[in-house]
Amino acid sequence: MSKGYEMVFAIINSGYSEEVMEAVKACGATGGTVINARGTANLEAEKFFGISISSEKEIVMIIVKKDIKDSVLKAIYEKVGLSTPGQGIAFSLPVDEAVGLGKTLEE
């Protein structure tokens, strides 16, 4: 079983998942999973952020080693953060244990 990992989530406007994957692979991540989603932000949220919020989203999930998590989050922010057309947010959650991740992560 693998330990010492974080799950990084990036929620971005639809069509920007490839940019996320390019950015995180440059930091040492090996891959991720993309899920199509729909946002539910209301007009008040749009007024607060001062931007138009698209309801069509993609969620990119990437399991990374803890030691590269900060650089992965920074790369996502720089590539598709709120001030970009991707209008993304990113966060991480600890992974207590994982199995079946393949040889790359279990070494």
Task: List PLM regions with ranges.
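Positively charged, small/polar-rich N-terminal and surface patches that mediate targeting and assembly
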Residues: 1-107
